[in-house]
Amino acid sequence: PAKTYSADEMSLEIEVALNSYLNKGQYDPVFEDKISSLSDEGYDNILNQIYNYGQNLEKYKNLYDKFDEEGFRDFFLPHLNSMSKNHTATGETFNKIGKTDILIQDEKGINVFIAECKLWKGESELSKAIDQLLDRYVTWRDEKVALIVFNKDMKKFTELMTKAVEKLKEHPQFDKYIGKRKDSSYQFTFKHPDDSEKII
């Protein structure tokens, strides 16, 4: 295999997954009837799943310290695939002119959700990440997207998030800051780079 894991690493990964699956409630992963290419509820459900799964991963520093962007992405994909019997989540999937980190499609092959994963390297890199997402992966029909940023160093995290939000507001395609979804999750709308009337 391209990458091997120790028994301790596998144990940690299984524990994270089990904690997420067994912690039933409003974030029960199955939502096969609620997700569609136009559903805000389905979009919120995906974002909540990613947020809560990531929040649980924060407890296992020995595991995530070894992850690069691809490692984080691969860790989330099985969980995203468990959310619906009628949708498929894939990684490094070609869309438009490049390979996006996470692509969820329905059974007809219609894109439902696109996400790009990045390690935090300063707020100046956020604009490049948005450019990459909008210019390379998002077609005119794609509306539900996310930029997932992983930060291994939690020092001055509140200040970091404030700077990140302000930086995103400066992006040329910025349309509106909708607000904070959760402690470290923020929602924006952007204009499509090829059509300013198309909002993403």
Please place each PLM-identified region on the residue numbering.
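Domain-level recognition of nuclease-like catalytic cores that cleave nucleotide substrates
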Residues: K152-I200
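Short acidic loop-to-helix transition motifs that present clustered carboxylates
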Residues: N95-K99, G122
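Acidic-basic catalytic patches of nuclease active cores, encompassing PD-(D/E)XK
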Residues: G42-G91
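Catalytic cores of nucleic-acid endonucleases
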Residues: L119-P172
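Pyridoxal 5′-phosphate
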Residues: G91-E92, D101-I102
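Active-site beta-strand-loop-beta-strand hairpin of nuclease catalytic cores
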Residues: L103-I114
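Short amphipathic alpha-helical segments
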Residues: L38, G42, D68-F72, E125, ...
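Internal, Lys/Arg-enriched amphipathic helical interaction segments that engage polyanionic partners
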Residues: P1-G42
